[in-house]
Amino acid sequence: MNAYPVTDAVTYVGADDPDLALFEGQYPVRPIGVSYNSYVITDQKIAVMDTVDARVTEAWLENLDYALDGRTPDYLIISHMEPDHAANIARLAALYPEMKLVGNAKTFVMLRQFFGPDAAPADHLVTVGEGDVLELGSHRLRFFLAPMVHWPEVMVTYEESEKLLFSADAFGRFGALSLTEKAPWAPQARRYYLNIVGKYGAQVQALLKKLASLPVEAILPLHGPVLTQEIGRCLELYDLWSSYRPEEPDRVLVAYASIYGHTKQAALALADLLTERGADVTTCDLTTTHVSDALTQAFCCGKLVLASVTYDGGLFPPMEELLNHLKAKNFQNRKIGLMENGSWAPQAARLMRARLEEMKNLTLCPTAVSIRSALNEGSRQQLQQLADELLAP
């Protein structure tokens, strides 16, 4: 059991999933896993804040039983209907048939889709809208709709007396709490945000504006730790990420996709040139780095170099995968350099340029380095030109 008090009235009852390999079936989280968070607010009336993934049902029920201490919950607040948070709604409703479910209109559409038309009696559904308040006693829950952060039915809850923000998936982080207790929040929160929520920057900006006037003493997300320190910094990072601005505008990421090492050699030669000129440079081998990590690095940097071999007349799949993910997550506002390699018909630069032109507000350097099999004097001169263009103001 890992239930613990957040405040005198709020208890954490979530559960860790340290053995999960892929979050959402695609993002590697082993060996740190993930947490599925749920909370109980105890007052004259009791509210359970969300359920958990089916993988951790029994651990959650044990924690919940401890927190309730024989009492019956009056409300289940449903922040988000994604199954890693909503899988146990029907189970909890069956255990406590008098409990009411609190959500917005879109919540209950999805509730019926997941659990059937008779998921809950109509008189057990409490529909709330923007700014509505639910009184528990001395605790007052105010609801704010957060559509597409990152599903359409999402809402966040602000507890007014203790100034607590129950933030749904916003401000979440990868990592089971038992395994990442002392880990800094930002690295895995950044990777989580950019890969899970990153497409919806405008919607996150809208939510941040709604919350701007609220004093917040703690943020209680559905993944990762409860945030009680440096909340201002967490809000600043969310504002930065959701506005598609780089955290490190002058840093250059050189991401390369190489088969036999010649494209890698050229990419590292460019990285050396840039470093010699005082640039902060990071390199990324796309054949060994998961695309979620490469994407995270790309969003951090103000400048990106893409170096790819030509493959079957097209892009080498690791580079194509990165470009697909960058487009899907709304990558923008960066300076881009291109490098290609091909032994008889290099096509990668043209194809990468075409994909990048589908994205917003990207500045492509005029020089695209074109290599025939291996670096030679001519392509080394192109590297010099590209380095000049990348570092130009």
Stretches found by the model and what they are:
Residues 3-65, 156-159, 163-167, 263:
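Conserved beta-strand hairpin/beta-sheet module of binuclear metal-dependent hydrolase folds
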Residues 4-8, 103-154, 200-208:
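Metallo-beta-lactamase
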Residues 44, 55-102:
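Active-site metal-binding motif and surrounding structural segment of the metallo-beta-lactamase
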Residues 45-47, 75, 139, 163-166, ...:
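Structural motif
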Residues 49-51, 73-81, 101-104, 165-168, ...:
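Active-site neighborhood of phospho(di)ester-bond hydrolases with catalytic His/Asp-centered motifs
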Residues 177-219, 223-226, 269-282, 294-393:
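FMN-binding flavodoxin-like domain, especially the glycine-rich phosphate-binding loop
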Residues 223-249:
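Terminal amphipathic helices with adjacent charged low-complexity linkers/tails
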Residues 255-277:
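Short, charged N-terminal beta->alpha structural module
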